[in-house]
């Protein structure tokens, strides 16, 4: 792959690639990304959570991890990944920087899978929906706010999911 093609692949969106040009695993990634374009998608592949294309570029920059590539020739896709056992650490860093993260897990044991391992979105984590005590500041609230307008005014609801507090 020449330098010009490599550079264009680094800035290319996985959504701009026709599905038939992708591997089955990359199509799984593309399907989740298509439905959750505002999220960084972390796809469990064996012992790693992997991010591709624009998400790989963002993760590499924000998490200070290596940006590499998967595939050969014209099909090379920017890739950044973290070991599965470090998910909470890296998820915390992304959440603190304001990112919304979609976690895609393997839904079956890869050793038992016939063909492509089934994967599915198991959760979306945002700064307002995180409930893991290890990812929260102990002495700070973590509110999420909802605003609804109607003909004669508006209403507000605020909740801290980590403590169960709810205000209207």
Question: Where are the model-predicted features located?
Answer:
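Basic, polar low-complexity surface loops/patches
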Residues: 1-168
